[in-house]
């Protein structure tokens, strides 16, 4: 992985009681040792694989102002990180669920793009077996389950300040909402809505195939083409390029897909991030609620699965063998 650390700082917030978060600040930056580089590379990998929300700094953002001064050389990175951790502590202290953790600021470069990663990591206890096969206690940073994370694309921020997507963040778990304190700390608001872009794409694809008067099999083939392209982009860490997708769909209609979306006013960006959960709807129908979970391939609708919108009834012809066996055992009294 072509990742180079410019500067990295580590601090800690310790919850002493329900009212107080103690601030523990390092007096020096971390050295970019092999272990540190491997840790940041793992953070980068884990974060890049997750669905993210996009945002931008508010005009009054204290973090943005401090970061701008640091980038201009008026403040060093350590001082910037120490002051920012203090502001984070002040925001966290407003919420009863604040647990503290290891606060990390890392300025790094990956594939010619500069980033600032800010995260709060849990330092967890576990066990390990040593070379003598004895079991000893150990501690580790819970990188895989980090949910308080934000990353600023410094290159995008400085070259295109009008962008609505240079800042990305994770929304967090229920009951631990990033928007409640981390966005206040960042002084940021949501920008590009990736889910809305993906939903708009799905609607445009359906309308495009309908206008082209394709039959059911042809429509499903187009949806599969779109899914394959988008999934490849997602796996490669690339965005959906509308023009590239349009070329993939050449031949479907006399009008190109990109021309169709522009003429019909779908307001799709030229490129936008793929959203995994939304894109699944191209090839599958899925839903859950009231103790019921249903998931099936889109091609089965109208063949083995039928929906009556008047009665909101779903009829399934031919159940999966394992489900059939369970139902048969239950209805026969377990015999």
UniProtKB/Swiss-Prot annotation:
The keyword Cytoplasm applies. InterPro entries: Nucleoid_associated_NdpA. It is found in: Cytoplasm, Nucleoid. GO terms for molecular function: double-stranded DNA binding; single-stranded RNA binding. One of its GO terms (cellular component) is cytoplasm. It holds the Pfam family NA37. It comes from Salmonella paratyphi C (strain RKS4594). Keywords: Cytoplasm. This is Nucleoid-associated protein YejK. Belongs to the YejK family. It comes from the Bacteria.
């Amino acid at each position: 992985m072509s990742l180079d650390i410019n500067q990295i700082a580590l601090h800690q917030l310790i919850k002493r009681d329900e009212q107080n978060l103690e601030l523990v600040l390092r007096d020096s930056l971390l050295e970019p040792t092999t272990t540190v580089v491997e840790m940041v590379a793992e953070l980068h990998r884990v974060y890049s694989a997750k669905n993210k929300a996009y945002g931008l700094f508010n005009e009054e953002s204290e973090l943005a102002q401090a970061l701008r001064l640091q980038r201009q050389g008026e403040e060093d990175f350590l001082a910037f990180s120490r002051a920012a951790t203090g502001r984070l502590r002040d925001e966290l202290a407003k919420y009863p669920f604040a647990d503290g953790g290891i606060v990390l600021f890392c300025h790094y470069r990956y594939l010619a793009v500069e980033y600032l990663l800010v995260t709060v990591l849990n330092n967890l206890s576990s066990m390990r077996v040593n070379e003598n096969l004895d079991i000893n206690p150990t501690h580790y940073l819970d990188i895989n389950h980090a949910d308080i994370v934000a990353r600023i694309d410094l290159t995008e921020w400085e070259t295109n300040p009008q962008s609505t997507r240079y800042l990305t963040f994770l929304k967090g778990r229920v009951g631990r909402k990033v928007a409640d304190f981390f966005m206040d700390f960042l002084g940021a608001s949501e920008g590009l809505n990736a889910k809305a872009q993906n939903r708009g794409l799905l609607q445009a694809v359906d309308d495009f195939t309908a206008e082209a008067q394709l039959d059911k099999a042809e429509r499903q083939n187009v949806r599969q083409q779109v899914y394959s392209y988008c999934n490849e982009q997602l796996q490669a860490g690339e965005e959906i390029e509308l023009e590239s997708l349009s070329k993939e769909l050449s031949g479907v209609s006399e009008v190109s897909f990109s021309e169709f979306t522009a003429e019909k006013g779908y307001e799709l960006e030229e490129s936008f991030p793929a959203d995994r959960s939304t894109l699944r709807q191209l090839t599958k129908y899925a839903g859950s609620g009231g103790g019921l979970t249903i998931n099936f391939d889109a091609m089965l609708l109208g063949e083995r699965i039928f929906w009556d919108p008047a009665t909101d009834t779903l009829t399934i012809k031919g159940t999966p063998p394992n489900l059939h066996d369970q139902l048969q055992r239950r209805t026969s009294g377990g015999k």
